[in-house]
Design a protein with these regions (language model features):
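Conserved functional loop/turn residues at catalytic and ligand-binding sites
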Residues: 12, 81-83, 87-88, 92, ...
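Conserved active-site alpha-helix within GNAT-family acetyltransferase domains
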Residues: 95, 119-137, 143
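Short amphipathic helical patch at the helix-1/turn junction of helix-turn-helix
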Residues: 64, 118-119
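Terminal substrate-recognition subdomain of acyl/acetyltransferases
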Residues: 144-149
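Conserved GNAT acetyl-CoA-binding A-motif
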Residues: 98, 105-116
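Acetyl-CoA-dependent GNAT
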Residues: 3, 7-80, 85, 98-99, ...
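Conserved acetyl-CoA-binding loop-helix of GNAT-fold acetyltransferases
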Residues: 84, 90-103, 126-130
Length: 149
């Protein structure tokens, strides 16, 4: 498999929404899910710190990871909505997207990365633990996971 990483543009919103729906259907084991609402992705394309990393096979988006930079009392990067389309899973794409986000965090001198993972998403939980993320807080149906880099 020959895929590359890139940065999403506004024109990629529909495909990103399709992958988001696919992710939700997998996690919740139902077809009855809603995608992003109109305008939900706009903040990732307005030139601020937030952006979406994508994996491409030729010109087809096969995966994405939303990256949010938070400048609060403690600065951190929040990783949101990682989705790899089914036929490309278990090929290191999710790992590469996360590694890309970690490199970005180091580039902008932010040392903490966190995200939420559904407890039922065992494959994702194993991946994150393998990459050095630890459960920081049990929040009912999901965990808050953190890694200091």
């Amino acid at each position: 498999m020959n895929w590359t990483l890139g940065k999403a543009e506004r024109k990629d919103s529909n495909r990103i929404n399709e992958l988001f729906i696919e992710m939700l259907q997998t996690i919740y084991n139902t077809k009855q899910v809603n995608g992003y609402s109109d305008g939900d992705l706009d903040r990732f394309f307005d030139g601020r710190d937030e952006w979406i990393s994508i994996a491409l096979d030729d010109d087809n988006i096969i995966a994405f990871l939303s990256i949010e930079v938070h400048h609060e009392d403690e600065e951190f990067i929040y990783l949101d909505d990682l989705s790899v389309t089914k036929q490309y899973r278990n090929n290191g794409i999710g790992t590469k997207l996360i590694s890309n986000a970690e490199a970005y965090a180091q580039e902008i001198d932010i040392r903490t990365i966190c995200f939420h993972v559904e407890k039922s998403n065992i494959a994702a939980l194993r991946l994150y633990e393998r990459l050095g993320y630890a459960i920081h807080e049990d929040q009912g149906s999901r965990y808050l996971m953190i890694k200091n880099i």
